């Protein structure tokens, strides 16, 4: 497939508001692609350059894109930055500038989908002193040979921000329709493989294999998530439940196979080098090959420390030994996804728990199994007294559903008025904060993963955190116009609020009353932020409409 055809399909989809129509467009194209092209096409459509389980990064930000584009159009970098600041949509700006470029190429090569992918892989593997220069040259090559429309989507791919309305659900529907595979089999394969490109490849080449895929060591899968709820309603609905402490820690997934160990964050980024002590503890605690779900907490004088304490360890790239002495970590494990090569996610939670206890000789999280709301309530208050956030309630017959935030796991906390949102923009501050970002624009996501603005937040951010946030965001700036700065949307805030209100001022149709910054959620991926569906559910519960 020529890349221009890919760009034309993207353009068609971008102008399509119907989810079903988008799935139909993809389902029509999937069978026409070669076995090598299909997984690349699927990933690119979602703005992904690598499988979801991979922690590989392109290492290419907005600043390098500005430099590459300036070279291609024969203008100064400041001209490019000004154009982007005035327009905002970086893809469409690149399209426009390539269309108007003065430095016309006497010859150009047609871009092929697989050649573009090979360039991206080469950029990701660049290392050493000249790595940025090598990435820049690759970007210059791609943009120099691009048509204006190709340039729009190349730029978005380089920043891994496609945003054309192709979410996981749309791709799964398209795979099912294109190759006649039942949707539940596609869903199960995606849960185990965590790569829709590979799911599509198997559906095309050997659909029977989709029913027999397994979770594989060192290919992390998404973690099962929880909704908010109440003890009473859970007991009334399910009867006997498992209650566990809800730790104020950092979620992890531990993999051990053939004597090798690795640990991954909630965002599926490997953090083995940052947490060697935790890896060693878990390695010693089992003689089995395992994939385990858990949470690591910081401890001082026998009591849990705040989440931000752990972040200081996880962020540490150097002098990890000194950090180990300063901050003591303790892992708790509470679920098991695979043991000795066998995938366990389809087993009921009660059976997975028994297997977990049989393969681990330490660090298994304490648990209460009860059908008494009063007993669970007492367990909840005891957990709070011990410095935890609250408790988790889990349905004993539930499978492990990677990436699913359903009603099988429920979190019980004193405050239910916090929400995870992604930062999309900021306003420069005033007075002594003039060189810092003063307020931040926040967004939730719709069913396709497209971002919808819902609130601004400035309250609750002290000077120290403002400095931290400036350092975090300064290299993520995409555009700047007046006092408004637009960012790559990949930083998540946990935000408190007094009330959720309906509003026409924001794209989501809701607004937060008295929003306040609670904490930075480095451990969370943008895919985990609040959805429009869950906001609607929150609003209904708040107003007792359910």
UniProtKB/Swiss-Prot annotation:
Top-level EC class: ligase
Single GO term (MF): ATP binding
Active site residues according to the UniProt entry: 246 (n6-amp-lysine intermediate)
NCBIfam families in UniProt: dnl1
Cross-referenced Gene3D superfamilies: DNA ligase, ATP-dependent, N-terminal domain (1.10.3260.10), DNA ligase/mRNA capping enzyme (3.30.470.30), Nucleic acid-binding proteins (2.40.50.140)
Known role: DNA ligase that seals nicks in double-stranded DNA during DNA replication, DNA recombination and DNA repair.
Pfam families the record matches: DNA_ligase_A_C, DNA_ligase_A_M, DNA_ligase_A_N
One Gene Ontology term from the biological process aspect of the record: lagging strand elongation
PANTHER family for this protein: DNA LIGASE (PTHR45674:SF7), DNA LIGASE 1/3 FAMILY MEMBER (PTHR45674)
Cofactor: Mg(2+)
Residues binding ATP, per UniProt: 244, 251, 266, 295, 334, 405, 411
Gene it is expressed from: lig
Organism: Methanocorpusculum labreanum (strain ATCC 43576 / DSM 4855 / Z)
Matches recorded under InterPro entries: ATP-dep_DNA_ligase, DNA_ligae_ATP-dep_bac/arc, DNA_ligase_ATP-dep, DNA_ligase_ATP-dep_C, DNA_ligase_ATP-dep_cent, DNA_ligase_ATP-dep_N, DNA_ligase_N_sf, NA-bd_OB-fold
Protein name stated in the entry: DNA ligase
EC identifiers of the protein: 6.5.1.1
Keywords: ATP-binding, Cell cycle, Cell division, DNA damage, DNA recombination, DNA repair, DNA replication, Ligase, Magnesium, Metal-binding, Nucleotide-binding
Family membership: Belongs to the ATP-dependent DNA ligase family.
Substrates-to-products reaction catalysed: ATP + (deoxyribonucleotide)n-3'-hydroxyl + 5'-phospho-(deoxyribonucleotide)m = (deoxyribonucleotide)n+m + AMP + diphosphate
